[in-house]
Amino acid sequence: MAAPIAEELAKKQQAISVAEFFEKNRQILGFDSAPRSLITTVKEAVDNSLDACEEAEILPDILLHIERVGKDNVSVIVEDNGPGIVKEQIPKVFAKLLYGSRFHALKQSRGQQGIGISASVLYAQLTAGHPTSVISKIGPDSPAHHYEVMINTSTNDPEILLDEVIDWDRPHGTRVELEMEASYVKGRRQSIYEYLKATAIVNPHARLTLIEPDGNEVIFDRATDKLPIPAKEILPHPHGIELGTLMKMLRYTDRQKLAPFLRYSFSKIGLLTAEEICKAAGLDTEMLPSKLTRDQTKKLLDAFKKVKIMAPPTDCLSPIGEELIYKGLEKEFNVDFIATTTRSPSVFSGNPFVVEVGIAYGGVLQKDDRIDIMRFANRVPLLYQQGGCATTHAVEGIKWKQYGLNQPGGGMPTGPVVLLVHVASTNVPFTSESKDAIADIPEIRDEVELAIKEVSRKLNRYLNRQVSLKKRREKEIIITKVLPKMAQKLADTLERDLPDINPVVAKVMGNLLVMRHVEHGANGDAAVTIKVKNFGSKLTEFKLHDMLPYEISDVSPEPKVISMGSDFDYVWTMKVSPEGSKAVTYSLSSMSEDEIKRLPQLIVEGLDEELVTGAKAIKGLI
């Protein structure tokens, strides 16, 4: 009698390893084209280096060297100054999928699943047939270990082809070299250069060096020597737990009583809250957690929603901060205006998250193009699937006309704008394993929208101010053309010297007037008086600079003195009320008439040039 068909089918059924699955489905992880495969590999390696350096409190110094090998392949070398990897862990870190230290850690980090760099090793061996070379050293007195590894896709275990100790001049760090089928592209948004530029903006403490295939070297230098505040690991929050997960936790806990289990397994549950939860669920605080039935566990889960539990702690997050986002944008873009914000932390499904936004306007940015959106998750640039990201949806949902930007068709606005959006969380909800786009979680989208609107209001105030200043500028141009002619005619008629028209211009325009008066004594000494009068309607704050190649004496009030080689910058910080005035006096010794005539122009820092008469104005920072 023939065997039943079910028995024949059973003979063909077998388990597959995760490595085999991704071997046949590598596009899921971002290896679906030659350019993207290279970006994915670089991204995973750089993420690992940044995470390792920050955990060891080392300012990251990362080298990326890319070379073409033959017609279709490239060699990728990523070298860092991190803490290194202990010998026994090197093969597993690079040649075993789903092996890592962060999957169960509830804190903000770039990598989490333990797939990234090992997926690149798998792609390299599939397309180029070569092992991956790894060198790592954990200290100046420790040896450098050199491995060549591949992945056994049948078992998802590392295959070690070479294991040796070598001389390496670095005191500590890791170097990984892979050859793969990929292509290096330039001049487009999705490129290695743009990825590193974006990474440098949100990681201003890192120094990134790129050596391109043609030998060109690009350095993205650090903008700060201050390391990010390290994120702390937290316990899971009750609002983010699902039924099956709670059942598993109850089954395998070492706690003998339900109340202590709740207290020490979840964040923000103290003794009183644990007792309140048990009461709401109708459960005894003394009962053995592992004995709870499915129905009892469901009641416990429902009680989490009934009892008021504080939001999870936010020290598990490490936001960039408004100041460093500003510095990052300022370093990489030549623009006229920058505004930044870091929102207060929020929560979705028990996961804390924070949204940060920066907006840059003007300068050399293209006026007629769509705005440039730079998306980030846990300090990592998101270069692909922009249309499917919650960030993009939030941008498209805003009415940009009220903020001074055009929005043809009601979609993406146009204008000379770079918009940076960073979402940091213990669990960023990506739409796929390739981690290219953030899912449309209502809480996240709302926070992104609020943050964008906050910086956009600042941009709108700036744009309105520019319109006002333009009108003032046009008015002043007319006045400064007409008044000199009137003054000259009057002087000729009365046979007098041509008067200084600056006080008249300042009064008509409502400007800050700055005047220097010098009395030259017979002995060559000069008494200098600088008068400042505010003809405006608001309190004016600024810094007055007098940059001289001389030392001054008998000065009042005392300035801050900055030595500049053979010159001195004398700086007074001033506040002048409407219609108010202030004066600075000092003496200069042994001055000739020519030297007095050559005294440099005074500088006002902190005001627009349209608001100042009689001195050079620089915007600066007060």
From Swiss-Prot:
Q: What is its EC number?
A: 5.6.2.2
GO BP terms: DNA topological change
* Listed Gene3D superfamilies: 1.10.8.50, 2.60.40.2960, 3.30.230.10, 6.10.20.80, Histidine kinase-like ATPase, C-terminal domain
Q: Does the keyword Nucleotide-binding apply?
A: yes
Lineage top rank: taxon: Archaea
Q: Which UniProt keywords apply?
A: ATP-binding, DNA-binding, Isomerase, Nucleotide-binding, Topoisomerase
Residues noted as binding ATP in the record, renumbered to the chain: 48, 80, 101-102, 111-118, 435
For this protein, the parts annotated as crossing the membrane are: none
Q: Which InterPro entries match?
A: HATPase_C_sf (IPR036890), Ribosomal_Su5_D2-typ_SF (IPR020568), Ribosomal_uS13-like_H2TH (IPR010979), Ribsml_uS5_D2-typ_fold_subgr (IPR014721), Top6b_C (IPR040494), TopoVI_B (IPR005734), TopoVI_B_transducer (IPR015320)
Q: Which principal EC class is assigned to this enzyme?
A: isomerase
Name the Gene Ontology molecular function terms of this record: ATP binding; DNA binding; DNA topoisomerase type II (double strand cut, ATP-hydrolyzing) activity
Which reaction does this chain catalyze? ATP-dependent breakage, passage and rejoining of double-stranded DNA
**Subunit notes for this chain?**
Homodimer. Heterotetramer of two Top6A and two Top6B chains.
Q: Which family does it belong to?
A: Belongs to the TOP6B family.
- Functional note: Relaxes both positive and negative superturns and exhibits a strong decatenase activity.
> What HAMAP family does the record tag this protein with?
Top6B
What name goes with this protein?
Type 2 DNA topoisomerase 6 subunit B
| Record organism | Methanococcoides burtonii (strain DSM 6242 / NBRC 107633 / OCM 468 / ACE-M)
